[in-house]
């Protein structure tokens, strides 16, 4: 691709994103589609842009992203995590600012498994006294 590109892997729930950053004019490509085409939901787009807006690099970098697995919010979170890691590789001085905003830490929450004898992970069947 480019001679001076930076890479970051992001994960969230069951999604994994590979993010490549290079100097450019703010173009974001996710799985060969634009950000607006890929995420119909405005909140997901905002989540993806958060780290770039924080460090004021929205118009300075081009992003090429591939993401697999999970749903919309999981993929958006994985992309945000990947962008954060790639930005830290690009400029280590951004780490403290990104850490304060909480983007550096991987959100380790996973779906709790369904248990035998229960309807869902914790939901019990209705109890009848008589």
UniProtKB/Swiss-Prot annotation:
A GO BP entry: cytoplasmic translation
UniProt entry tagged with the keyword Nucleotide-binding: no
Transmembrane segments: none
Record keyword Metal-binding present: no
InterPro entries according to UniProt: Ribosomal_Su5_D2-typ_SF, Ribosomal_uS9, Ribosomal_uS9_bac/plastid, Ribosomal_uS9_CS, Ribsml_uS5_D2-typ_fold_subgr
SUPFAM superfamilies for the chain: Ribosomal protein S5 domain 2-like
Any one GO CC term of the record: cytosol
Keywords of this entry: Ribonucleoprotein, Ribosomal protein, RNA-binding, tRNA-binding
Superkingdom classification of source: Bacteria
GO molecular function, one term: structural constituent of ribosome
Quaternary organization: Part of the 30S ribosomal subunit. Contacts 16S rRNA. Cross-links to the P site tRNA and weakly to the A site tRNA.
Function, as annotated: The C-terminal tail plays a role in the affinity of the 30S P site for different tRNAs. Mutations that decrease this affinity are suppressed in the 70S ribosome.
Family: Belongs to the universal ribosomal protein uS9 family.
Protein's UniProt name: Small ribosomal subunit protein uS9
